[in-house]
Swiss-Prot record:
Primary localisation category: cytoplasm
Record field: catalytic activity: tRNA(Pro) + L-proline + ATP = L-prolyl-tRNA(Pro) + AMP + diphosphate
Function: Catalyzes the attachment of proline to tRNA(Pro) in a two-step reaction: proline is first activated by ATP to form Pro-AMP and then transferred to the acceptor end of tRNA(Pro). As ProRS can inadvertently accommodate and process non-cognate amino acids such as alanine and cysteine, to avoid such errors it has two additional distinct editing activities against alanine. One activity is designated as 'pretransfer' editing and involves the tRNA(Pro)-independent hydrolysis of activated Ala-AMP.
Record's protein name: Proline--tRNA ligase
Entries under HAMAP family matching the protein: Pro_tRNA_synth_type1
BP GO terms, sorted: prolyl-tRNA aminoacylation
GO cellular component, one term: cytosol
Quaternary structure annotation from Swiss-Prot or TrEMBL: Homodimer. May form a tertiary complex with YbaK and t-RNA(Pro).
GO molecular function, one term: aminoacyl-tRNA deacylase activity
Gene expressing this chain: proS
Length: 572
């Protein structure tokens, strides 16, 4: 490709509304342009990267035995009504009517469509297992699209769905897809973790997220220092260690009129924060017990995903408002505690090991100090309620936990029979009777993968693609002052034709631009290998080579240039 025949839309300045590095660099590199909130045009440089990511995904999925299909973006409402998600899905689901007043949606996901397709096409257990995938546009009407294509309303996703007669068959395909995803992200050169995860609105049982580690990530990824354990913080089990110590002081009621938060209590009374507890009131699952207290240590954070799995707690978790709390307990939120509490309470495992702690007295402006379980208050139900923190023991007993930010780029689920039962997707079983199929689903955010690679691999000059496979071009030819030097132009043209004939994805910068501009643009878009042709060096029989990833520069004899490039690219 010649730059003179290419839409090369780089920007010198960073747009003011771009908050994260990937958004900034994708705009500056001429990969994307905004059209409306959460909607982007993909320009030639961006589409080249996108298609190369799709190629890797497609090749690895095919190797794993999946079969490609393509399903409509527009889906009839009847399928969503049949699955039950028409009423369950929130405003992210864009609904509309056609001119016949029939309801449709723009698909945020395709479980209903694929289940309908398979129940029509597959009739016998002999046709299973079956794993179908597509690479298709999705639309979710995000309330606040942000971070460029990282969280846009329209995006491209690879979604696969497998169908089985048994849980064992599903597990086998799930294990294959786990390895396929690992192969994809390794091939793309990404630093990632496969972590245990919550199934969320998709439903099902077992689930793993594939998280690219990056400081701009929205998720907290937890992993062990000494084992393969890794989990999303929502699912990571918090292990409480040690034993509860014997009381050392009598419980006392203290006036605390100006201490309505843990921070204020700690500061005003010089208390160790790990000797305080906080009490949070949430809605109960049982109408006879409409409010439930959740009690965690003062320096810990409530894990809402864990909490809503307790049978006493409403799912999804909902906090009670201050009016409800005041009416039932008699005090405001700043004075709540375990002593003399008139609603069911659940305490975190760490709290169960505490002694001589401080908590609200359920009287406005008062706290109890030196509270001890069993002596001053009966120990309530104990449950894992908190987020883990760095240094906690790993749940597998090996090492301690570290926490890093992550960007979710892939997610695999064991759906079970959630959709197949609702939509009566059956096959004839081995015994001749109808058998409800068991399902798995497996998604990769293709557009998000592009942004994640940039978040993880960049410098002050621009993008550094982690793999040559996904760079927009593999080699850049930069001839300095070519239009003033016949020798430079001739050599550059010959090299360009040779590389093209050998299948190298090469960009030839034939613009009438200053060398500094040409270098800056090629570094900005992240071309991994740059060949710089200057008249003086050419007279000496040498060509300059630059490696974008390592920063390496070297002079190479022009007679050996192709063999050296062959070694560096490994595919000439």
């Amino acid at each position: 490709m010649r730059t003179s025949q290419y839409l090369f839309s780089t920007l010198k300045e960073t747009p003011n509304d771009a908050q994260v590095v990937s958004h900034q660099l994708m705009l500056r590199a001429g990969m994307i342009r905004p059209m409306a909130s959460g909607l982007y045009n993909w320009l030639p440089t961006g589409i080249r990267v996108l298609k190369k990511v799709e190629k890797v995904v497609r090749e690895e999925m095919n190797k794993g035995g999946a079969i490609e299909v393509l399903m409509p973006v527009v889906q009839p409402a009847e399928l969503w009504e049949e699955s039950g998600r028409w009423d369950q899905y929130g405003p992210e689901l864009l609904r509309f009517e056609d001119r016949g007043n029939r309801n449709f949606v723009l698909g945020p996901t395709h479980e209903e469509v694929i289940t309908d397709l398979v129940r029509r096409e597959v009739s016998s257990y002999k046709q299973l297992p079956l794993n179908l995938y597509q690479i298709q546009t999705k639309f979710r009407d995000e309330v606040r699209p942000r971070f460029g294509v990282m969280r846009s309303r329209e995006f491209i996703m690879k979604d696969a769905y497998s169908f089985h007669t048994t849980q064992e068959s599903l597990q086998a395909t799930y294990d294959v897809m786990y390895q396929v995803y690992s192969n994809i992200f390794n091939r793309l050169g990404l630093d990632f973790r496969a972590v245990q995860a919550d199934t969320g609105s998709i439903g099902g049982s077992a689930s793993h997220e594939f998280q690219v580690l990056a400081s701009s990530g929205e998720d907290d990824v937890v992993f062990s220092t000494e084992s393969d354990f890794a989990a999303n913080i929502e699912l990571a089990e918090a292990i409480a260690i040690g034993e509860r110590q014997a009381p050392t002081a009598e419980m006392c009621l203290v006036d605390t009129p100006n201490a309505k938060t843990i921070a204020e209590l700690v500061e005003q009374f010089n208390l160790p924060i790990e000797k305080t507890v906080k009490t949070l009131i949430v809605k109960g699952a049982d109408e006879n017990q409409p409010l439930v207290a959740l009690i965690i240590r003062g320096d810990h954070e409530l894990n809402e995903i864990k909490a809503q799995k307790h049978p006493l707690v409403a799912d999804p978790l909902e906090f009670a408002d201050e009016t409800e709390i005041k009416a039932k307990i008699g005090s405001g939120v700043g004075s709540l505690g375990a002593v003399n509490l008139n609603i069911p309470a659940i305490i975190d495992r760490t709290v169960a090991l505490m002694s001589d702690f401080s908590c609200g007295a359920n009287i406005d402006g008062k706290h109890y100090f030196n509270v001890n379980w069993e002596r001053d208050v009966a120990i309530p139900k104990v449950f894992d309620l908190r987020n883990v923190v760095e240094g906690d023991p790993s749940p597998d007993g090996k090492g301690t936990l570290q926490i890093k930010r992550g960007i979710e780029v892939g997610h695999i689920f064991q759906l079970g029979k959630k959709y197949s039962e609702a939509m009566k997707a059956t096959v004839q079983g081995e015994d001749g009777k109808p058998l409800v199929m068991t399902m798995g689903c497996y998604g990769i955010g293709v557009t998000r993968v592009v942004a994640s690679a940039i978040e993880q691999h960049h410098d002050e000059r621009g993008i550094i693609w982690p793999s040559d496979e996904i760079a927009p071009f593999t080699v850049a030819i930069v001839p300095m002052n070519m239009h003033k030097s016949e020798a430079v132009q001739k050599y550059a043209e010959e090299l360009y034709r040779t590389l093209q004939s050998q299948g190298v994805d090469v960009i030839f910068d034939d613009r009438k631009e200053r060398p500094g501009v040409m270098f800056a643009d090629m570094e900005l878009i992240g071309v991994p290998h740059m060949v710089v042709i200057g008249e003086k060096n050419l007279d000496n029989g040498e060509i300059e080579y630059k490696n974008r990833r390592t920063g390496e520069k070297e002079m190479i004899s022009k007679d050996k240039l192709l063999s050296v490039l062959n070694e560096k690219l490994g595919n000439l």
